Amino acid sequence: MVSLIFFLLFLSCGSDSSDNGQPIIIDKKYVLPYPIGKAYTCSQGFNSSPSHLGTFSYAIDFEMPIGTLVTAARSGRIVYILESYSDNDQIDGHENVVIVMHEDSTYARYVHLTLNGALVHMNQIVVPGDTVGLSGSSGTNGGPHLHFDITKTFNGKSDQTIPFDFMNTISHPVGLQRGVTYEALPY
């Protein structure tokens, strides 16, 4: 009991950032955006070059072959679908995307889906693990992958991302790390 009290006091007095200045994520509401048992490598994490800076600071890229199943990371309602762009055109703004609004009015964005890769419809309710779409290589990118992020607003491409973590893999309180492969564990 004394240990528990000390631990809680330690948490309440601690800083809300890590030694490298990144926020420490305590609330893990999300699951990895791919099926249980599958594993993919993080090709770009939080606050990293070339593109996860500024408004995109808190985003994760997973290397995935075109056509890989992408699943809902949290319960919500489909509020936006764009799936009309071809893979590999390397044109900024041609990113196919599905956006899910959560109960707390945050938004999950599943970006770079393949042409006609949305496997949901507008206003559809999804729960963690439901199929959302198929990964791709649409828009400007360095190869086939899924770009996943969370925002508090949905006004367009430049919405500010917010920190998040996943409950069904190895915990990283400052975000997943580039070059590490993460298996989606049961939750």
Task: Annotate the PLM regions.
Residues 9-12:
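C-terminal motif of bacterial Sec signal peptides marking the signal peptidase cleavage site
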Residues 18-23, 28-30, 122-124, 149-187:
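Acidic, glycine-rich catalytic/binding loops that coordinate metals and/or anionic ligands
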Residues 73-119:
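Zn2+-dependent peptidoglycan hydrolase active-site motif and core
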Residues 41-43, 61, 70-72, 98-101, ...:
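Structural recognition of the beta-strand scaffold that forms the well-ordered cores
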Residues 41-74, 81-90:
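Short glycine/threonine/proline-enriched tight-turn/helix- or strand-capping micro-motif at secondary-structure
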Residues 69-80, 119-135:
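Short, well-structured beta-strand-loop connectors
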